[in-house]
């Protein structure tokens, strides 16, 4: 069976081939790919990601095949040029299943618009179309403006602007969910919000894998750093 993943990160071995620094996020996805291959010898896995290049690049010298799509003008706005690349990938790899990881990026929508959706599934990693309305945490806009920094002004990236960007990505997300026929999620929250957008979609429950460290280490009181609160990394 041939499975094509659409990912928001470039996996470490592809980064090494491109002489790029591997990402510090999304390690669970790479761990999941390795576990999937180890438990399914008949599986051919390919991963499509955006990269800062100018042409479609194919890497075939690893157990996972990589398709690197030109980022062109970033990943925040929909770019119709992505459609031709996804079509080329589908024709070249001929996947039996297309698995899109994450619903919030416009290139996921490009894949859904272009490729066969009959055997396509999207994994929900959160829903920006819902998060956007809570992005400011109930803090009044005028109070946020008072706390603007030099960085916010120079980069034109204040919290209200970030919220606006999330609303836009949320619209891409809603379009995607109305196209696909299958969605993977983990919680009742996922399921309820997916069905609110697309009532006829088939919802599948599936927990995600974790990074290998979580499976090889065990918490013990006598070795822990006491009186410390551990927080996971946060992107937003």
Predicted feature residues:
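A short, charged, and often flexible helix/loop element on the N-terminal side
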Residues: 61-87, 100, 153-165
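Active-site proximal beta-strand in glycosyltransferases
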Residues: 2-6, 97, 115-155, 184, ...
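Acidic anion/phosphate-binding donor-loop and adjacent secondary structure
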Residues: 195, 209-226
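N-terminal subdomain of nucleotide-sugar transferases
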Residues: 1-54, 60-64
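Short N-terminal targeting/anchoring amphipathic segment
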Residues: 89-105, 111, 121
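Conserved donor-binding/catalytic core segment of Leloir-type glycosyltransferases
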Residues: 4, 220-236
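Membrane-proximal helix-turn-helix segments that form the acceptor-binding/catalytic region
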Residues: 144-183, 191-192, 196
């Amino acid at each position: 069976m041939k499975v094509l993943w659409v990912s928001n990160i470039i996996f470490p071995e592809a980064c090494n081939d491109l002489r790029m620094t591997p990402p510090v996020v999304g390690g669970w996805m790479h761990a999941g790919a390795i576990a999937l291959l180890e438990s399914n010898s008949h599986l051919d896995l390919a991963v499509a990601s955006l990269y800062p290049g100018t042409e479609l690049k194919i890497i075939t010298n690893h157990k996972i095949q990589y398709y690197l799509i030109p980022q062109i003008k970033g990943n925040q706005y929909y770019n119709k040029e992505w459609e031709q690349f996804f079509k080329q990938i589908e024709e070249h790899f001929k996947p039996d299943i297309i698995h899109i990881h994450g619903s919030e990026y416009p290139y996921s929508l490009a894949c859904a618009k272009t490729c066969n959706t009959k055997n396509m599934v999207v994994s929900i990693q959160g829903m920006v179309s819902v998060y956007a309305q809570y992005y400011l945490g109930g803090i009044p806009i005028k109070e946020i403006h008072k706390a603007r920094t030099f960085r916010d002004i120079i980069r034109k990236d204040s919290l209200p602007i970030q919220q606006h960007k999330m609303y836009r990505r949320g619209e891409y997300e809603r379009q995607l969910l109305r196209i696909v026929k299958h969605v993977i999620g983990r919680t009742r929250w996922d399921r309820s919000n997916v069905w609110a957008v697309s009532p006829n979609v088939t919802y599948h429950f599936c927990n995600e894998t974790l990074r290998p460290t979580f499976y090889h280490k065990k918490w013990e009181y006598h070795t822990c750093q006491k009186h410390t609160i551990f927080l996971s990394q946060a992107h937003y």
